[in-house]
């Protein structure tokens, strides 16, 4: 299938709302975007195919039933290699940029050290994305046109959900390369199908994570928690169980649903789509009962 990048100045988000929200759940996909600005491609020292390897390809399609299940759904249309919405706003490598920086950058993180800040320095292959330094003015430009609209919309959906139900759960949907699915395992020939990330117990009620793990395991999927992915910026920012705000990151092994080399869906993608629909339905049912608002203390 021919892939044609486009460069719109708007419409950077895909936001789909249910006709009526019936579950305290918001589903988001920050890394499935595939709209590549032409100016970005002109800056790139690597091929479009190399850039696309960073995408959580087709994840927005795997979770597309969310609105039909009464859950808002948000996906970034901009690509992760251009702006990573699962990073802090100024989590950046200052050495990438030319010109005065807008403010001090948070550059002392393991993600920045790996070249994977809000504006990534390297592609999935480890190759440098850019031919030279990036004009520092692009930091604010990309924040204003991509990062801020995404998090403004996501924050609004979560806050509306919390006001409606007294609690809210963010399901942060991702995929992982099959090469990463054995990381952290003692037996290297065993691969993980799903990684559930709750920031090591800090971002989501344990009962909900237990429920998701049981449901997936009962269907023959190999599930692991927090290894190698415990959750990124969104999980940490939006997961505060003590405040009735929960966040659970779900990583799906790409080999389950796509040919990673050809960047194409496999026939099994429809099976994974049905599984994710079933998981969302189960999570929604459980969230309605598990995430009841706490009664106010007597005065």
PLM-predicted stretches and their roles:
Residues 1-170, 175-248, 252-299:
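N-terminal catalytic or cofactor-binding beta/alpha core of small enzyme domains
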